[in-house]
Amino acid sequence: MKNFKETYEKFKKNQTDATVAAKANLYKATLSRIKKETSPPNRNYLWALAMALELSVDETEELFAACGLCMDSQYHLTDLEKERENIIKECIANGKYNLLELNIRLYEEGYRLLGNKGTN
């Protein structure tokens, strides 16, 4: 099994880290820490990266697995977190990768936004 950095590099194609971080609404330092494995990625960051990289559902599962997580494992999530993740999964499954539009929807429905730049 590949680690996060290998999996991320496979999916980022020709994009720079700065571009991916901006599209994922993440600080560049956050992405750098995740890549160096000095900071384990949380689900929020992985979802944001999946959106920014325009991953399919299977590719998103691969990204989660590279971090030792399961995309569909919701046993430790609250009902609100499960509902939020279902909205995100729906966007990915339907190829809707506009993070701003998704964050507006999450905000309007009272959920935490994706990314860590200017989010709650």
Question: PLM ranges: what are they?
Answer:
Residues 1-18, 96-120:
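A short, Lys/Arg-rich alpha-helix, primarily the initiator
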Residues 16-23, 49:
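Short alpha-helical "recognition helix" segments of helix-turn-helix
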Residues 18, 29-32, 58:
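Key DNA-contact positions within bacterial/archaeal DNA-binding proteins
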Residues 24-41, 65-68:
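Recognition helix of helix-turn-helix/homeodomain-like DNA-binding domains
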Residues 27, 42-45, 80-84:
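N-terminal alpha-helical segment
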Residues 38-52:
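Short, basic-rich loop-to-helix N-cap that marks the start of a DNA-contacting helix
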Residues 61-97, 101, 115-117:
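Short, charged recognition helix plus adjacent turn
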